[in-house]
Amino acid sequence: MTSRNYLLLTPGPLTTSRTVKEAMLFDSCTWDDDYNIGVVEQIRQQLTALATASEGYTSVLLQGSGSYAVEAVLGSALGPQDKVLIVSNGAYGARMVEMSGLMGIAHHAYDCGEVARPDVQAIDAILNADPTISHIAMVHSETTTGMLNPIDEVGALAHRYGKTYIVDAMSSFGGIPMDIATLHIDYLISSANKCIQGVPGFAFVIAREQKLAACKGRSRSLSLDLYAQWRCMEDNHGKWRFTSPTHTVLAFAQALKELAKEGGVAARHQRYQQNQRSLVAGMRALGFNTLLDDELHSPIITAFYSPEDPQYRFSEFYRRLKEQGFVIYPGKVSQSDCFRIGNIGEVYAADITALLTAIRTAMYWMK
């Protein structure tokens, strides 16, 4: 164990501000109105407002990682007669397929490969051929590769065919501008420790209230019952059904203040985008190649091919970077040898410049 603080170049958990960390130094009572009404309800309102200005949406907070909320939505939104089309081009789309299988949810997995953008015409053909499909689910920012998926085009299809639309916006909400009403999203899922720049501990769902109200009695789980969690928060003014992660919630409330201070989602998106472009330009200058073409990249995380030099080992490269205060991510692509570098969190232009200098120093195979 070390007390050293590293700059996390990961898609979350990520480097947080000192003030977000300090917000956790306060202990809260989960029954107290100062906490439930003064903090939790304020967060719920702020999240809904960030997602859309349209009426008819609500938000639910849920203990656990982002995957808990994905499973809660799938397990609560789909009834026994329903079927979901899962658009998958990475580990997180594949995880939705696995969840659906374990819960006995009828599903059609459209796997377009890890480095391919989903083909909207192919999705159209699937929907046209199978009228039993009632829901569509997909990942927006697929951090397996750094791919940004076309949720707008798929949303238009969902609307045209009258399907319920579920979007895993884990690594995009708060960092990429969006209006879920315009995008025809019925359930948007994200997490505290991503682009809002809080710490791990809970996820959240922003949902069309009419859709959520229809989920009563559907859940395949007690603790992941999205409807029951929502009703508890609605009826008890922010009260969680089970133990609330109070310190994480306080950190998130502070993170929302800092998002507003930065200039909102548009300003944060601009910073992330500039970080990513500077990173890619600098890495290419050092001889690295990106897994994806530029037009496919999200501004969140980038996958780079590993050097072909026989001396290269990711573990050694990682160690040398960590010694200089930087932590990067191993690859998750099954068909290619890659590593990944994220650029979200408390990461600014000077940090990217310092990282590139550290990478040059860590390239032991070039010496």
Swiss-Prot record:
HAMAP family: PhnW_aminotrans_5. Its cofactor is pyridoxal 5'-phosphate. InterPro entries: Aminotrans_V_dom (IPR000192), NH2EtPonate_pyrv_transaminase (IPR012703), PyrdxlP-dep_Trfase (IPR015424), PyrdxlP-dep_Trfase_major (IPR015421), PyrdxlP-dep_Trfase_small (IPR015422), SP_NH2Trfase/AEP_transaminase (IPR024169). The modification N6-(pyridoxal phosphate)lysine is found at K194. The keyword Transferase applies. Its EC number is 2.6.1.37. Homodimer. Belongs to the class-V pyridoxal-phosphate-dependent aminotransferase family. PhnW subfamily. GO terms for biological process: organic phosphonate catabolic process. Involved in phosphonate degradation. NCBIfam families: PhnW-AepZ, PRK13479.1, transamin_PhnW. This is 2-aminoethylphosphonate--pyruvate transaminase. GO terms for molecular function: 2-aminoethylphosphonate-pyruvate transaminase activity. Keywords: Aminotransferase, Pyridoxal phosphate, Pyruvate, Transferase. It catalyses: (2-aminoethyl)phosphonate + pyruvate = phosphonoacetaldehyde + L-alanine.
